[in-house]
Amino acid sequence: MSESGLKEQITGKVEKTKGQVKEGIGEVTEDRKLKNEGKWDKTKGTIKEKVGKVKQKISDGLDNKE
């Protein structure tokens, strides 16, 4: 199992959650900038999470060949 892949997945989930919180606060306070920052953080988190999953699958595949 790839440690870097797992680490990237966790980092992505944290960033995505942070984005959801920011977006929610921005929505409630009608702060467009904060809301947009939250959306961007969610997007970055989703990407990191998916990259981590791919890294893990590749690593698992390489481990199975050994």
From Swiss-Prot:
Comp. bias (Basic and acidic residues): 13-22
Any one Pfam family match given in the protein's UniProt record, by short name: CsbD
Record region (Disordered): 1-22
Family label: Belongs to the UPF0337 (CsbD) family.
Record protein name field: UPF0337 protein BA_0987/GBAA_0987/BAS0923
Taxonomic lineage: Bacteria, Bacillati, Bacillota, Bacilli, Bacillales
